[in-house]
């Protein structure tokens, strides 16, 4: 009986830690530029797609270059956003196979799913405005007036189309019948929606001035999205305050509820995760930790990049680094600036 109990416990653990295939499509970032994407059979050569995404590729071939670009943006933006953290998103480069930091329902996995969902919709919305996607153009002009001295013009980012097509592609793996545990599906669908909510909230009015001698008597305005790096920073804030959840029966169905705060439901605006993460101090590829040995740290910082936090109390080593920068700049009439290149030595620090 004890053996059966342990086996059941182990299988339950696997069901709740194995991820569905939600972010394997990030492997598209490795697609060679030489690969043509002008015929449906080319979809078979794309890495990381599940069958439903493959079908979307065949029926929406014109979107695939944009989606490939989105995968590259996710990787670049994630690494940039976490450059000051112990977990620095470097394992995202392993797509379509990952270590446990992204293979399990972790806080890190929550962030990457949210960013991926936001990025694909963001990239498609922007591609519509630049004319890169046939059959999709600028967003419609809003019905309400922008206000006195303002007028609608320019080319607004087509957010509605971006979310429509982006969610079809990025959510497709989680909606497959055989794609991991129900708990993981619910978690990743929730976090993907949080990413899209942050994207929607980033839509803002942007304007250009018109008038005699730059008087700006009239402003032409449109609605545009913030840069993906700004959206990533908003999601990073949510990552830091993410809520741990459990898959628990409520009524006739199971739902994700906060593990420690059973009196309230999961908030639609917060990232959620099922499995706690390690501290990422020491290298352990089995759990997806690259460690912080030889990571650069900031001796004077009080943040996550400080040498105390980044190095996990192991201490740090100084080294001297040469920096070349512009200096002795002069303005010449009219109208250009010339500078010289100066070299200086700065002290930097890496973790022991």
Curated annotation (Swiss-Prot):
Residues 1-22 form the signal peptide. The modification Sulfotyrosine is found at residues 273, 280. The keyword Disulfide bond applies. In embryos, expressed in the neural tube, dorsal somite, mesenchymal cells within the dorsal fin, branchial arches and heart muscle, becoming expressed throughout the myocardium by the tadpole stage (stage 45). Prior to neural crest cell migration, expressed in a domain flanking the neural crest on the medial or neural (the opposite side to wnt11b). Weakly expressed in the developing pronephros from stage 25, with expression increasing from stages 30 to 35. GO terms for cellular component: extracellular region; extracellular space. GO terms for molecular function: cytokine activity; frizzled binding. Keywords: Developmental protein, Disulfide bond, Extracellular matrix, Gastrulation, Glycoprotein, Lipoprotein, Secreted, Signal, Sulfation, Wnt signaling pathway. InterPro entries: Wnt, Wnt_C, Wnt_CS. Disulfide bonds join 78-89, 128-136, 138-155, 207-221, 209-216, 281-312, 297-307, 311-351, 327-342, 329-339, 334-335. It is found in: Secreted, Extracellular space, Extracellular matrix. GO terms for biological process: canonical Wnt signaling pathway; cell fate commitment; dorsal fin development; embryonic axis specification; gastrulation; heart morphogenesis; negative regulation of canonical Wnt signaling pathway; neural crest cell migration. A lipid is attached at residue 213 (O-palmitoleoyl serine). Glycans are attached at residues 38, 88, 298. Glycosylation is required for protein secretion. Ligand for members of the frizzled family of seven transmembrane receptors. Shares much functionality with wnt11b. Signals through a non-canonical Wnt pathway to activate Jun-N-terminal kinase (JNK) to regulate gastrulation movements. Acts in a non-cell-autonomous manner to control neural crest migration, probably acting as an extracellular signal from surrounding tissue, but is not required for neural crest induction. Acts redundantly with wnt11b during pronephros induction. Regulates cardiac morphogenesis through the activation of JNK, but is not required for cardiac differentiation. Xenopus and other lower vertebrates contain duplicated wnt11 genes resulting from an ancient gene duplication event, but the second copy has since been lost in mammals. This gene was originally called wnt11r. but was renamed to wnt11 to reflect its orthology. PANTHER family: PROTEIN WNT-11, WNT RELATED. Belongs to the Wnt family. This is Protein Wnt-11. It comes from Xenopus laevis (African clawed frog). The gene is wnt11.
């Amino acid at each position: 009986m004890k053996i059966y109990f342990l086996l059941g416990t182990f299988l339950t653990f696997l069901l709740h830690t194995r991820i569905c295939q939600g972010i394997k499509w990030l492997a598209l970032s490795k697609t060679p530029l030489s690969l043509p994407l002008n015929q449906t059979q080319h979809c078979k050569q794309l890495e990381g797609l599940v069958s439903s995404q493959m079908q979307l590729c065949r029926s929406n071939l014109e979107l695939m270059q944009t989606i490939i670009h989105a995968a590259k943006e996710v990787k670049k933006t994630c690494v940039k956003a976490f450059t000051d953290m112990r977990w620095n998103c470097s394992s995202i480069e392993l797509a379509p196979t990952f270590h446990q930091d992204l293979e399990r329902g972790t806080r890190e996995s929550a962030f990457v799913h949210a960013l991926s969902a936001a990025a694909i919709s963001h990239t498609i919305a922007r591609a519509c405005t630049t004319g890169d996607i046939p059959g999709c153009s600028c967003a419609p002009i809003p019905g309400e007036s922008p206000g006195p001295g303002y007028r609608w013009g320019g080319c607004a980012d087509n957010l509605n189309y971006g979310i429509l097509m982006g969610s079809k592609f990025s959510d497709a793996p989680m909606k497959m019948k055989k794609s991991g545990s129900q708990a993981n599906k619910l978690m990743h669908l929730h976090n993907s929606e949080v990413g899209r909510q942050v994207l929607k909230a980033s839509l803002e009015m942007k304007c250009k001035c018109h008038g005699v001698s730059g008087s700006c008597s009239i402003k032409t305005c449109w609605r545009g999205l913030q840069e993906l790096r700004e959206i990533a920073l908003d999601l990073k804030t949510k990552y830091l305050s993410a809520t741990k959840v459990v898959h628990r029966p409520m009524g006739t169905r199971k739902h994700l509820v906060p593990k420690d705060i059973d009196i309230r439901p999961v908030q639609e605006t917060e990232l959620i995760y099922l499995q706690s993460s390690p501290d990422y101090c020491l290298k352990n590829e089995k759990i997806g930790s690259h460690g912080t040995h030889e990571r650069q740290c900031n001796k004077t910082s009080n943040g996550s990049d400080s040498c105390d936090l980044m190095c996990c109390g192991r201490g740090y080593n100084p080294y001297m680094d040469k920096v070349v920068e512009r200096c002795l700049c002069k303005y010449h009439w009219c109208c250009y600036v010339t500078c010289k290149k100066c070299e200086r030595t700065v002290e930097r620090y890496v973790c022991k």
